[in-house]
Amino acid sequence: MARHPRWTLSQVTELFEKPLLELLFEAQQIHRQHFDPQQVQVSTLLSIKTGACPEDCKYCPQSSRYKTGLEAERLMEVEQVLDSARKAKNAGSTRFCMGAAWKNPHERDMPYLEQIVQGVKAMGLETCMTLGMLNESQAQRLANAGLDYYNHNLDTSPEFYGNIITTRTYQERLDTLEKVREAGIKVCSGGIVGLGETVTDRAGLLLQLANLPTPPESVPINMLVKVKGTPLADNDDVDAFDFIRTIAVARIMMPTSYVRLSAGREQMNEQTQAMCFMAGANSIFYGCKLLTTPNPAEDKDLQLFRKLGLNPQQTRVLAGDNEQQQRLEQTLMTPDTDDYYNAAAL
């Protein structure tokens, strides 16, 4: 059963056509019904395996098909990941997201992934991963390890999708979201503005997300970061008001979801970001880099928070800074079965 009434494309189109200030007012009212408007959830994103991805996503510098100057890197060592998580927590993040440039993880990678989830969770941080497509077994193993969120974006509308990606179908993305949900992991899924899509495509993306059996708990809205060497490097800039409008419509359609102001913040001024928060955005990525693209420095974000009277949201998780953390960190690098496989060692 759907948690909310199903939306139609005509209803979503009507929202996009509303006068902007009226739309912002409606979005802010809905936002205040479900969230503290002064609280912003703060996440940090780390690339645990960079580049050499076999996919052909036209926006992505990590694709092996494009010459962007990005050098491929092997999987990070477990302790490197945990050290980055500690730094993220000390900087104020409450959720640590880990991404790998894969079409999908291999079975041999699963023990490594399970261990870093357990290690990060033991620090009292929420955990999130984006690893490509998952099968049922992989989703359940990550759930059993304690993974809180799994990110798998739809990127755009079903109609425009084939113009951007051909190596993975839209239905495969939806199937992964279903497997994640069935495993008991919270869903993080959103899209990108600036791919060359129309307003109808933006409406179609949000329609897909909002009409999932349960809408995503987290909805990242990205502004395209144009990277030289990718097919979309010369795309037109996104109008700030169009981006703000997309945030507002997402908030109205998914009132209880966290709407994340995601990639592209480095190219937004403070006024644009402030209007995004007014439109209902209540989550950001914090730190100087999102996988391989720039993000505002931590001190700039703190200054903006002070100017706007915003505060990082505090999150409690079941595992915290206690003896469990010490025990896990002592055993993380010690194989306990003959089948132990350390993906980082390859």
Curated annotation (Swiss-Prot):
PANTHER family xrefs: BIOTIN SYNTHASE (PTHR22976), BIOTIN SYNTHASE, MITOCHONDRIAL (PTHR22976:SF2)
Name of one Pfam family that matches: Radical_SAM
Annotated binding of [4Fe-4S] cluster, by residue: 53, 57, 60
Keyword S-adenosyl-L-methionine annotated: yes
HAMAP family tied to this protein: BioB
Function statement: Catalyzes the conversion of dethiobiotin (DTB) to biotin by the insertion of a sulfur atom into dethiobiotin via a radical-based mechanism.
Binding site for [2Fe-2S] cluster: 97, 128, 188, 260
Textual note on the cofactor: Binds 1 [4Fe-4S] cluster. The cluster is coordinated with 3 cysteines and an exchangeable S-adenosyl-L-methionine.
InterPro entries: Aldolase_TIM, BATS_dom, Biotin_synth/BioAB, Biotin_synthase, Elp3/MiaA/NifB-like_rSAM, rSAM
Reaction catalysed by this enzyme: (4R,5S)-dethiobiotin + (sulfur carrier)-SH + 2 reduced [2Fe-2S]-[ferredoxin] + 2 S-adenosyl-L-methionine = (sulfur carrier)-H + biotin + 2 5'-deoxyadenosine + 2 L-methionine + 2 oxidized [2Fe-2S]-[ferredoxin]
Transferase found in the keyword field: yes
UniProt GO BP: biotin biosynthetic process
Keywords in alphabetical order: 2Fe-2S, 4Fe-4S, Biotin biosynthesis, Iron, Iron-sulfur, Metal-binding, S-adenosyl-L-methionine, Transferase
Gene Ontology terms for molecular function: 2 iron, 2 sulfur cluster binding; 4 iron, 4 sulfur cluster binding; biotin synthase activity; iron ion binding
EC number: 2.8.1.6
SUBUNIT field: Homodimer.
Name of the protein in its database record: Biotin synthase
Cofactor: [4Fe-4S] cluster; [2Fe-2S] cluster
Pathway terms, separated by semicolons: Cofactor biosynthesis; biotin biosynthesis; biotin from 7,8-diaminononanoate: step 2/2
SUPFAM superfamilies noted in UniProt: Radical SAM enzymes (SSF102114)
Radical SAM core domain: residues covered: 38-256
Family: Belongs to the radical SAM superfamily. Biotin synthase family.
Gene3D superfamilies listed in its UniProt record: Aldolase class I (3.20.20.70)
